[in-house]
A protein has these predicted regions:
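Juxtamembrane interface at the cytosolic side of transmembrane helices
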Residues: 503-536, 582
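Membrane-proximal extracellular juxtamembrane segment immediately upstream
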Residues: 459-484, 536-564, 606-609
């Protein structure tokens, strides 16, 4: 693929030497493909990756002209139903672009101040888990840096009867605030949905109703639904019920091959503004084209579109934009902006270059699809290695960033505080000082001061620091933050798991001895047994956390962890008392008692440190 792109780029460069730059720009994509050849290139790409898709739809446009649009594959392979112009796909987080357009519309009307405290627009006391005094503004929501951790509660339900109002869903799923507003980028579905709720509050309209009146109808998007249950468009619902979802992974060289039929995979997103929009390729193309229209029908004034497409957040102290009022910036051979989306039933991507007015939309009926959602935009916009950010970069310093990092888009409060240490990023410098590895695998390559390129990707990392001096590796919609304790926390989890296994073995041996009538009572035997059972109980709690237990079990499991921690402490006291008061105790028995005391103290500390008792966070 890279060879093909390289050849195309070389040909385009040679051609540009014979023609004026204006003519070349008007008739080629940013990667150098002539408009007339776009279909040939995409279809060749589809053939090259024919084992990687069930169905996808792609469109390429330039201004108000659609250069290419086609549906590939099947929405129901079992019944041989091919995708067509009536096929609807879930757009996932591309839905957030509708939130941000709505916000900018209300800002244009003078009804919404982007820099005001959002509590101005919310019911009194709505936000109950704020940690910092600094106000959260709409700009923080647009840039995903309000400081919230990930949500712990399920954001979608399988039964339509379980759908609740947007306000109730937000109240029920409010995450803890773990970062100071403006300090750290941490992608937040909850924060985006909160912005959608503010649109409701400010406009006085139901969010879905607002979108239909102010975005869908002006653009002629009649084949698009907004509500989580499709109640706003019966036709879309009927079409959606025909579409199956698939999980296809096709990397045989890595031993990763999977092809699974997921059925319709229909679910109902409670925070629906953040991810429920569903519609056809034609409709999403209309929406995308509006962003490169000089007379954008979304706003009264062209200045509002200009403001929306201007940078609102940057990487560190650089002049490299990260976000443009809710739209993520991606550096291909040219700078683009847009949004990707993923749901249980599909993946999507919308990308455009405001300078050339060229754009791409890709829709699929596949979970976690990346080959087409990211491969086709690269085909059209080229590779970052041809971008001035890359070609003009120079390495004048080499900071040592080796260490352990946790993602800002994580869980840091409550009983799931254990999560970051189970998924942290260890970085080491390889023999080449500009190559970094993680667990022996290539992780990133330095290509400039503070700049690192990810393997086989147009994504890059920018090295900066947090307000408290920790190294922070910024990566588009989130960051990796240096954490000196996370490796020790991971070790503690391993030690505890080992203690649980040892405890289980000891109980089995004890049971066998009792059955064989060879077991002899020991001093403080009940206290020792209670501590062992409590350790097992905490082990069960840990397993339930790791397997994503049902939300209904949250409170009882936390209570079990709390009670078990207390039992371990009490057991430690009585066992220690026996250890020091029983004068005739043999040496081996003393070792066992000391081990029991240490195990109980470790378990109690484990419960407290990882907040396994904390169900209210």
């Amino acid at each position: 693929m890279k060879k093909i792109l390289s050849a195309i780029l070389s040909a385009a460069t040679a051609f540009s030497m014979l023609c004026t730059p204006v003519i070349a720009a008007e008739n080629t994509t940013p990667s150098g493909i002539e408009f007339a050849n776009i279909g040939t290139e995409i279809e060749a790409f589809a053939e090259e990756n024919k084992d990687s898709y069930a169905s996808f739809a792609a469109a390429v446009f330039n201004g108000d002209e659609i250069l290419y649009s086609k549906h590939f594959g099947y929405i129901d392979r079992e019944n041989n139903i091919a995708a067509n112009e009536n096929t609807v796909y879930e757009w996932g987080s591309i839905s957030k672009m509708f939130i941000w357009v709505s916000v900018m519309q209300l800002h244009e009307q003078g009804k919404l101040d982007l820099n005001a405290d959002i509590q101005t627009y919310l019911p009194e006391g709505f936000l109950k888990k704020l940690k910092y005094d600094e106000p959260i503004t709409m700009m923080n929501l647009l840039n995903h840096n309000a400081g919230w951790e990930e949500t712990k509660s399920a954001l979608e339900v399988a039964d339509e009867a379980d759908i609740i109002s947007l306000e109730e869903a937000l109240r029920k799923t409010e995450p803890a605030q773990t970062f100071k507003p403006g300090d750290v980028t941490a992608y937040s579905n909850w924060g985006a949905a909160l912005a959608g709720y503010i649109v409701e509050r400010v406009s006085g309209m139901d969010y879905a109703e607002y979108l239909h009146k102010n975005i869908l109808e002006p653009l002629g998007m009649e084949q698009t639904s907004v509500s989580s249950d499709y109640r706003d468009n019966d036709w879309v619902r009927a079409q959606r019920e025909k579409t199956k979802a698939y999980l296809i992974i096709n990397y045989p060289e890595m031993g990763m091959v999977m092809d699974e039929d997921l059925g319709t995979a229909m679910s109902y997103i409670l925070l629906y503004p953040a991810g429920s929009v569903t519609g056809t390729l034609a409709d999403i193309t209309k929406f995308a084209q509006a962003f490169v229209d000089d007379e954008c029908p979304l706003f009264e004034n062209t200045e509002t579109l200009d403001l929306m497409l201007s940078a609102s957040d940057f990487y560190g102290n650089s002049d490299i934009p990260k976000n443009c009022h809710g739209l993520w910036v991606t550096e291909y051979a040219v700078r683009t902006m847009g949004h990707g989306g993923n749901t249980n039933a599909g993946s999507a991507n919308l990308v455009f270059d405001k300078e050339s007015k060229t754009g791409v939309v890709v829709l699929t009926n596949q979970q976690s699809e990346a080959v087409f959602c990211y491969g086709i935009p690269e085909l059209i916009f080229g590779n970052i290695e041809n971008n001035p950010i890359y070609t003009n970069a120079a390495i004048t310093q080499r900071n040592d960033i080796s260490g352990n990092y946790v993602t800002s888009r994580g869980l840091f409060e409550g009983m799931v505080k254990i999560a970051p240490c189970l998924n942290y990023l260890p970085l080491e410098v390889s023999e080449n000082p500009d190559e970094l590895t993680s667990a022996g695998m290539p992780a990133m390559t330095r290509f400039g001061d503070n700049l690192y390129l990810l393997p086989d990707s147009n994504d890059f990392i920018y090295e900066t620091t947090t307000s408290d001096g920790k190294i922070m590796l910024e990566y588009s919609s989130m960051a990796y933050i240096e954490d000196d304790a996370v490796a020790n926390e991971f070790t503690a989890v391993i030690i505890f798991a080992a203690l649980v296994i040892v405890t289980l073995v000891m109980l089995i041996v004890k049971g066998i001895k009792k059955l064989a009538k060879k077991y002899r009572a020991i001093p403080a035997g009940k206290a020792v047994l209670a501590g062992q059972l409590a350790r097992l109980a905490v082990g069960i709690v840990l397993v339930l956390i790791l397997v994503s237990m049902p939300e209904a079990l949250l409170v009882p499991v936390c209570i079990l962890a709390a009670v078990s921690g207390v039992v371990c402490l009490v057991s430690a006291v009585f066992t220690a008392k026996a250890l020091f008061t029983e004068k005739d105790m043999k040496k081996f028995a003393r070792v066992r008692y000391a081990f029991s005391v240490l195990c109980n103290l470790f378990t109690a500390g484990f419960v407290v440190y990882f907040q396994l008792f904390n169900f209210w966070a």
